[in-house]
């Protein structure tokens, strides 16, 4: 289903098989969006066809490829794991697993599907939910804990804030 957010196809710069098509564009089936064929060392000529679809919003390695090649980042998931408005309308709102099934069917119906193979792949699961974790870009912010700790220590040292029992203040300062 992440093909809905693909923004390039990468081939290895040393792979002579693809030299004549680097820089050209292809159209993503179902989506109809044109994407470029790019060169990037991340593409492994010995793995699969040697050409790799790049989805920067939903794969950590693809994100790095996207940054190196100034690729667009298209997020196709909501925070709840459903397909968002960046996908064709018939997929919007579908659960990611249902979307995957429908996309596969549509690829077969349109005769784009070539073959299916079983491969071993490491898939991350949540510790508590046991759900598959999908890479998902979000806004992040960071605080300077060292600067914040100055005031936090000060209020305990000056007794404006007290711990009961007192020995917990030692634990507080160790943190």
Regions found by a protein language model. Name each.
Residues 1-80, 155-175:
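NTP-handling and nucleic-acid-processing catalytic cores
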Residues 18-23, 89-100, 109:
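A glycine-biased structural micro-motif
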Residues 81-86:
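Short acidic beta-strand-loop surface patches of small beta-rich interaction domains
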Residues 95-123:
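Phosphate/diphosphate-binding loops
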Residues 116-122, 137, 166-171:
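Short coil/turn segments at secondary-structure boundaries
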Residues 126:
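Short cysteine-rich clusters marking metal-coordination/redox-active sites
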Residues 142-157:
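Flexible hinge/switch segments at interdomain interfaces of large molecular machines
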């Amino acid at each position: 289903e992440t093909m809905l957010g693909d923004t390039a196809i990468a081939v290895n710069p040393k792979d002579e098989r693809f030299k004549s098509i680097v820089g050209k564009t292809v159209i993503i089936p179902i989506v109809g969006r044109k994407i470029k064929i790019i060169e990037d060392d991340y593409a492994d000529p010995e793995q699969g066809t040697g050409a790799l679809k790049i989805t920067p919003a939903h794969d950590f390695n693809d994100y790095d490829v996207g940054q190196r090649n100034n690729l667009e980042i298209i997020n196709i998931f909501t925070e709840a794991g459903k397909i968002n408005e960046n996908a064709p309308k018939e997929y919007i709102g579908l659960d990611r697993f249902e979307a995957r099934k429908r996309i596969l069917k549509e690829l077969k119906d349109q005769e784009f599907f070539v073959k299916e193979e079983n491969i071993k792949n490491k898939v991350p699961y949540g510790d508590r939910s046991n759900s598959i974790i999908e890479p998902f870009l979000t806004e992040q912010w960071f605080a300077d804990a060292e600067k914040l700790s100055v005031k936090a220590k000060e209020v305990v040292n000056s007794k404006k804030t007290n711990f009961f029992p007192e020995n917990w203040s030692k634990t507080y300062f160790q943190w």
